Amino acid sequence: MLDSRARLLLKALVERYIADGQPVGSRTLSKASGLELSPATIRNVMSDLEDLGLIVSPHTSAGRIPTARGYRLFVDTMLTTQRDPFSVAGQMARIAPDQPLKVISNAAHMLSSLSQFVGVVMAPRRTSVFRHIEFLRLSEKRFLVIIVSPDGDVQNRVIFTETDYTASQLIEASNFLNSHYAGMAIEEVRERLKNEVEALRGEIATLMQEAVLVSSEAIESRDEVVVSGERNLLAVSDFSSDMGNLRKLFDLFEQKAQLMRLLDVSSRAEGVRIYIGGESQVIPYQELSVVTAPYEVDGQVVGTLGVIGPMRMPYEKMIQIVDITSKLVSTALSHSK
């Protein structure tokens, strides 16, 4: 689509704009590119790039800035790989492998600290499996279900029933579930209970079905996104001048539902993935870019992490930060088992 001269000028323009945030004029571009071209020739090339939708002229300046399409071409074809600017061994110490949730929060802080933008980490997906379940009577027709996951995490849920079960019935139900279904996926347990309900006493079967339902909800509800560094965006001129957009961004980080969807989609990709402008369609914010990568435990993808910042971000650096952090988290979580 572009000849070598146009590619060099576009690359120089994007790099210059990322560096100082100012629209790039023909004289500045001539110096930045290192090409011995007249300002008139450069203006002609810039006009062609503008016609292709790769750069645009802000109303307040005669210079040009990249569009989302221009950034995409730059990221896909023009990035130069630099040496790893971070000590992997040094950063490993910042992600303590003692507790999985501590690893996740430390990783989010590290991402925001290194990028000076927002770090996000989706906590490892939990399989809907229980290791042990117990019932505790709280009051008439009101019971506490205690669910222990395979990694030792304990969840408590209160259920209300139409029947007031006795202590012996509660013990019978928990013993049956633990002896027959411990270690199985919750969905499989639900299906088996449907098939075996006739062989069980009706009241007990109903209690167990309710317990399995709340167990599934309890385990799945632990999916979460850890966000760090939101205040970093206050120092980014691309955002700080528009309080309306800033409020939308902070709502995004507080609600987290859209972040969860984006990170979930990203977990199915291999390696680093970059969303520029509104490309993700999950976070429809044109001035935002997101760099993500999945992380693993023992070779299985269990979550995603990334950096969220302005479209005008140093992509080479962000890619390295995200890629290295995903590897560190994978190592830390695999070793913490």
Swiss-Prot record:
The lineage of its organism: Bacteria, Pseudomonadati, Pseudomonadota, Betaproteobacteria, Burkholderiales. InterPro entries: GAF-like_dom_sf, HrcA, HrcA_C, WH-like_DNA-bd_sf, WH_DNA-bd_sf, WHTH_HrcA_DNA-bd, WHTH_transcript_rep_HrcA_IDD. One of its GO terms (biological process) is negative regulation of DNA-templated transcription. Negative regulator of class I heat shock genes (grpE-dnaK-dnaJ and groELS operons). Prevents heat-shock induction of these operons. Belongs to the HrcA family. The keyword Flavoprotein does not apply. Keywords: Repressor, Stress response, Transcription, Transcription regulation. This is Heat-inducible transcription repressor HrcA.
